[in-house]
């Protein structure tokens, strides 16, 4: 089975197709989707003989992923917290809405479009790759390295190179463990060593905000049950900064620009203390289980990251629905001549 990471290819073609180079929006949209669809068709045809049918793994377009329900700060770092100009995002949303109208048409082709409520494309690929046949994952996402085995290969659409399990230096399980320990900054997943103890800045903020002392037990409950407190902390500090430098409502846009350039989130006082000795003891320790048994924060943080990063821990409800959707999928056979003509797809190659 050829398993295409839709989101990556979509983002690449979107970035390489600047709207301002087209005379009108309709021409722009048509050309963007023409390039995208022809790329899918090319991949499906090139690797069919070796890997079989092609599945397009599509993220839930509402972005209500199960990981966000499990950990509210998941991918929160991808939001623009400062910009007041949403024009660029609206263009993207417009394109995404247009794409949703194409998915039903693809059901009349050899490509299987699959989208499951609450799931990301990674989840779909991880679940379908468990079936006992050869698989080719089409993506540059390094998270898929954990899935490599004798039946699963990875094709980089960027370089055209195929990676197999034997090409990986070192143990895949060791690479996975290191990933869990250190988190994934691109997805907003912190290392297991973060948020063990509050910084002085966070403790003072909490006491001022809630008129009570931040005890060890309260901090543990806060970080494990309502991690969104991190955003509240940052928001209050940013607002205090703005008030202190005397910006007014009519200077919002100017302030936003200054803030984005001069006061990055990285410069906000951390909400937790950095403890390098803890990291050294975990990564160099002979019996990690004993260390975790004595430290409830490390234990919780490790299990949290394992659930978010390790694709063996995809939500069980998602797993069932992916399998059901794939097994009950039925291709349709409507007329797609107009569709192929519009997007310049040879009909013989997509049917």
PLM segments and residue spans:
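Residues within well-ordered alpha-helical secondary structure of globular protein domains
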Residues: 131, 150, 225, 260-263, ...
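Glycine-centered flexibility motif
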Residues: 35, 160, 183, 225-226, ...
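Low-complexity, acidic/Ser/Thr- and charged residue-rich accessory regions of DNA metabolism proteins
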Residues: 18, 32, 297-302, 307, ...
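Noncatalytic, basic helical substrate-engagement surface that gates or grips nucleic-acid strands
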Residues: 1-138, 144-163, 310-311, 316-328
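Charged/polar, solvent-exposed surface patches and flexible loops
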Residues: 12, 38, 42, 46, ...
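Helix-hairpin-helix
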Residues: 144-145, 170-300, 309, 315
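Assembly/interface hotspot detector across virion components, adhesins/toxins, and nucleic-acid enzymes
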Residues: 155-157, 162-165, 178-182, 194
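Short, surface-exposed amphipathic charged segments that create phosphate/polyanion-binding patches used
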Residues: 128-132, 166-176
